[in-house]
Each structure stands twice: as structure tokens, then as C-alpha cells.
Amino acid sequence: MLTALQLQQQRRRRALPSLKQQYHEYILQRIEAYKDSLSRPELLDLGNEALAEMEAAQGDQFLLTEVLLTDWVDRLIHKRLSLQPYSRWLKHFKLLRSAQREPTRWGIERRCPIVRLLPRLEQGDTALIIGGDAAPIAYLLAAHDVEVIFAGNDMTFVDQVESRVAEEALGHFCTTYVAPTTDFPPELPPQVNIVVIDTATLGKETSTRRRHVLEGLMARTAPCGIHLIVPSEHSLAPEAYLSHYAE
């Protein structure tokens, strides 16, 4: 992440994945999300339907393998979801990404501190986002090509975040984990540039555990990195946690 002085002297940026790569990743994530939404009987029915289509298309001229069946299942889901071909997706994607980079799309007010941070972001910057009320910031940062790890201890909510990320074609830049507040996701880099946590998550911990959490996050934050504590309903204001910081 650029410091204020470095804004005028941006270093060479790391190459982004191609649009083709992002498209294929988007398709894969939509298909996997659809599979995850099905019950076991529904998955079996889907497999039987795919098998019937294979037999109708190829007769006896095929050797059934798990890979082949999976490919036909994916084709069937692709059709059910009416996923766009690359050319149409590309036109939509460019407009979508521009809109996604606006804080208001995610319900984030322009006075939010994260908005002032956006001009300083660089490709390859990393962020750890913790807690449901911080999820909109995860989407916004991912739209700005930040490598985001979102963590929460509510599996249902984390699944919802994962689905939203897939629908918004942000999957390349945002990974989700279900994890206790005191446990860092396994793929978290040794240091990150941005840490965001909501007060509801902190409020559930004892004072001792809270200090342990914040000190652990500070230790994993890169020099000149940023910590942002965002407010949650029925929780203490973010300012209540300033005493945990030395400065």
C-alpha cells in the first residue's frame, strides 16, 4: 500500500490475471456455489440427468468416467444458470467493475475512513476482514484488486459472503473462511496491509481476549499498514477500543 509520499512515485504493479482467467474463475465459482446449494438427493438427481443427456448425445460411444460425468454436470448447471458467454460477460463486467468501485454500491458512506484509503491502494495489497458488519468493505477492497481474506465465525453468513463474491465476479480477489476470532486463516500472509474488524466481533470477547486478538492483528500488520474498527449495532463505539493501541 502506498504511503502519502509514494502516491506521486508509484512502483511497478504486479500483473493482474487476464480477463479470460477471471471469466473462467467466475464460471467455476458460480457452478460450485450452485452445487453447494443442493441437497444430496438433488445432487444425485442432477447426476442422473447429466447421465441421461450423455447417453442421448453419444449413445453407447463413450466410456463413463468420473471426470466425464462431472463435465456434463457442469454443462447442465451452466445451462440452468444461463451463464453468459465470454463476449457478453466482458461487456457487462467492465460496467460492473466500475460500479463496484463506488463505496455507495456497498452501502458505505463516503465519510468512512476506508474511502480515503482507496487512492493509496496498489495491486497486490492484502487485507484481512473480520466480522459480518465489515463484509461491505471486503467487497469494496476486492473490487479495487486488493487480495482480501474474509473471516467470520458464523458459517451461514460466511457462505452468504462467498455466494455474493461469486455473483459479483470478485472471487479472484476474495477468499472466505469460517474461523474463531483468535484463529487466523491458514492462507493469511505473514503480514497484511489492511485489517478491518467490527465491534460486534470484538464485543463478544473478554477484555483479555480482546487485547490478545488486537495484539495478534497488530503483529500481522505490515509497516505503514492500517487498522480499521467499524461499528456494529448494539455494540460499543470503535473509539472504546483505542486504549488497546499504543499511539
Where are these regions (language model features)?
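Conserved SAM-binding loop of SAM-dependent methyltransferases across substrates and taxa
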Residues: 134-146
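Conserved SAM-binding motif I beta-strand of class I
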Residues: 147-153
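A short glycine-rich, Lys/Arg-flanked "PGG" loop and its adjoining helix->strand segment in the class I
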Residues: 209-226
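A short SAM/SAH-binding and catalytic strip from SAM-dependent methyltransferases
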Residues: 190-210
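Conserved alpha-helix/loop element of class I SAM-dependent methyltransferases that forms part
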Residues: 105-125
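N-terminal accessory regions of S-adenosyl-L-methionine
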Residues: 1-101
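Conserved class I S-adenosyl-L-methionine
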Residues: 122-134
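S-adenosyl-L-methionine
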Residues: 160-189
